[in-house]
Amino acid sequence: MTRKNQVTKRPSHFMAAVGLLILSLALRPAIISIGPILLDIRQAFTLSFTQASLLTSIPDLCMGFLALASPLLAKRFGVNGTIIGSLVLLGLGVVLRSRMESVSGLLFTTFIIGIGIAVAGSLIGGWIKEFYSDHAPMFMGIYSTGLSLGATAAAAGTGALTSATGSWRVGAGIWAVLCVTGILSWLCLAKSHTPPTERRQSRGSVRLPWGNPKAWLIALYFGCSQFLGYAMLAWLASSMLQMHTSAIAPGYLLSAFTLIFTVANFGTGAIAGKSTDRRFLIAISSSLTVLGLAGLAFITTIAPLIFVASTAVGLGSAFTLGMTLPLDQTHSPQQANAWTVFTLFIGYLIAAVGPFGFGALRDLSGGFALPYLLLTAVAVLMLLLTPLLKPAVELRSEMDSAAQIPDLG
């Protein structure tokens, strides 16, 4: 089969966008749904703030460590088979966790959930690079948007379902439905993938960029953004409720955060285009994040929605940029997978400290000012990293030249 035939048998842009969006909807509710019902779970299992933070930190750790295993699984079972299997595992984990009666069972099923999210999520970058390198920022924006829409639905719906049914278990378990739709969608999308492409993709072995300083900078930037994002998703609603800072219900503040985060995801993907230098957008997003978190740390009683919105715009943009930066540095799907896996591994190990550190500081200090001050300091670090994230101009130019192949898909 010629290269031309291999290229023409990729999914169409529209079909791929829809399939990717539906898949991504399933990958965050299992984590985000914990935030609105965290106090209920703490009371049901008599957990401390530090222990409760593990419900968010465990998936982050999985997304870090298991990112390393994803390429091996994809080589053995194919990218599509691995993604579908991960969604099955995720759905089972969500259902089982909602039925657990012990702390150990709660944490174990959270670990299962983390495996499903980790393996599926770490393969998306290479999939985009394989079929849509000429539109990588746009497709990464669609993926990020789907993650955020799923998070928004979980943030808004979990509390409402819990109140309506009188049980946090319904609010935690209902999101397995999105795993079913994700599986069906990806099965349809997989039919448009050419088997020779997957076999070609798995032949080569590309090492992770352990010795590349740029890879470490990108991973650190991504890790800081996820440190902040998961800390906010885990603790925003609970902290606002206990601080009595706003007439707006804490659940709606969390929903506003995730909704604005979603808009920033998509908007950043749309405007990033094929620019060879993303540092201007990185600087803007980091500055907005610093402004928002500093407001929550020091003047929370004055219009917290404004500071929540500023933080959401900054972190929403940072996620799309952080996931796109590894693709900017690479020539091939194999390299893209290696850089993405490395970024996720380092990044999510850093991210796992966010919810845990926030909860631990809350236990130690008895308040939320110190935890939000920690988040502000991490946001400042993101801003300081901006000048160091120089573009790989030569690599990008070669990618743009390759993108001139006509799109016949």
Put a short name on every predicted segment.
Residues D134-H135, I142-A190:
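Helix-loop-helix hairpin linking two adjacent transmembrane segments in secondary transporters
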Residues T330-F368, L375:
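A late C-terminal transmembrane helix in Major Facilitator Superfamily
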Residues T109-G146:
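Cytoplasmic helix-loop-helix junction between adjacent transmembrane helices
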Residues T46, G78, R99-S104, S133, ...:
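Helix-breaking motifs and short loop linkers at transmembrane-helix boundaries and internal kinks
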Residues R278-L325:
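C-terminal transmembrane helical hairpin of 12-TM major facilitator-type secondary transporters
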Residues G35, P213-S255, T262-N265:
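Extracytoplasmic gate region of multi-pass secondary transporters
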Residues L66-G78, A264-D277:
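Helix-to-loop junctions at the C-terminal end of transmembrane segments
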Residues F65-S104:
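Conserved MFS/SLC helix-loop-helix module at the cytosolic interface between two early adjacent transmembrane helices
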